[in-house]
Amino acid sequence: HDADVTLKDIIAFVPKLNANPFFNTNRNTNLQIEGHIRGKVNNLKGDDLKVTLADGTYIDGNFSSQNLAVKQEEFLILELRQLNTRVSTLRQLIPDFNPPSNFNKLGRMRFSGSFVGFFVDFVADGQLSTDLGNAAVDMQMRLTDGPERARYAGNLSLSGFDLGGWTGSDDFGLVDFSSEVVDGYGLTGDLASARLTAAIE
């Protein structure tokens, strides 16, 4: 049940995965995998899975997927006990995922929770710990038109979050707040807008 493979090794057995942007872009990425994987490529499931990448990215959890070999129809359900990674790694791994550069300031991210949906249209619910502080998220996000036209809604709470470090402004410091985001649009500073109800503690 343990394996040390590259994605191109998997593609060699399942050529249809060449059509999948994740597999195609990351074909030389080395994975250490432990756990139980079963099913066919377009209906794959994994239990008690632990995956480690060379850059220190670590995933511990369960997953089920559909249509991995069908471009733009890849659907995932992830139940994550732990995801430890950086935004720069997610940019390389997830097709069309390119949030603004200030997301890099989050540094090493540790997430536990769930992810349900497509790479560019999903719901994420869980706890996030970053180099700038902590967050609890329950958000629906649609990135089908890119980060400039992203649409999102849900709940976000920040705890001990360095808003000054995030924005690059000395006018802000550490914040604790809970918010409900409605009709969020855009992830870039010049275009972003949303209706927000927030309680600052």
Question: Which residue stretches match the model-derived regions?
Answer:
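Short beta-strand/loop motifs in extracellular/secreted proteins, especially
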Residues: 152
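Outer-membrane beta-barrel translocator/channel fold
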Residues: 85-91, 164-167
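Structural signature of outer-membrane beta-barrel domains
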Residues: 54, 83-85, 131-133
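Short intrinsically disordered, low-complexity coil segments enriched in acidic
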Residues: 1-18, 79, 89-91, 197-201
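Helix N-terminus capping/helix-initiation residues
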Residues: 6, 86, 162, 187-188
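Extended lipid/amphipathic-ligand handling interfaces
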Residues: 1-3, 21-23, 31-42, 48-51, ...
